[in-house]
Amino acid sequence: MKLFCTNLVKKYGKRTVVKGVSIEVEQGEIVGLLGPNGAGKTTSFYMITGLIKPNDGRIFLGEEEITDLPMYRRAQKGIGYLAQEASVFRSMSVENNILSVMEMAGFDRAYRTERLETLIDEFGLQKVRKSQGIQLSGGERRRCEIARALAINPKFILLDEPFAGVDPIAVEDIQHIIAKLKTMNIGIIITDRAYLLYEGSILESGTAQQLADNPEVRKKYLGQNFELRKAVLHERVED
């Protein structure tokens, strides 16, 4: 199945912040949406997930158009979202953070119990499962948030700067987690093949190497002295 959007436009008053953006991701694929602050990345995510409506353009899940569906209906159909900002429920335990979304989705008790144990184990949350969200480190919080997003078995998940507020050691752990999601046949918008947004429009798309080799990308975003280094995420994805 494919999640894709065509020619998305978003305006705020006279200012157009997203200008005809088209993106697609297949299940089991990791796609990056790159760009400097203010390029329109988060706004594009908001439109795809249903947080805001586009002024123009269309969004599809498989053959079904979902442009006008509210966010909760898109979530029910398999579109998950992890916000850039911390979204853990601060006064709830890690266990209850994960259980709460399954309860709202209507899963039965037996499924919730089994799925909780699977996620706690997969994300290395055993030692903090009873801890409140406010007590977690940046890496623990992010792992909890990703586990919660996966609790309802999404087909696709949009990760908006998932490494924000996370220490370097935890970043590597989360890179491995994201790479593992690909093997679970979940489509992810973050990096493998990438789109680079600049001033609301797609400047370039392709592999990381193709973006790094593009003179306009170097001039407007990466800088002339940029050197592409293979990250752990890419190594794990390609294994």
State the predicted function of each range.
Residues L34-P36:
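The feature captures the beta-strand-to-loop junction immediately N-terminal to the Walker
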Residues I157-E161:
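Catalytic Walker B motif of ABC-type/P-loop ATPase nucleotide-binding domains
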Residues A110-V128, H176-A179:
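Conserved ABC ATPase "signature" region
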Residues N153:
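Conserved catalytic motifs of ABC-family nucleotide-binding domains
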Residues T49:
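Helix-to-loop junction immediately C-terminal to a conserved catalytic motif
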Residues Q132-L136, E140:
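Conserved ABC ATPase signature
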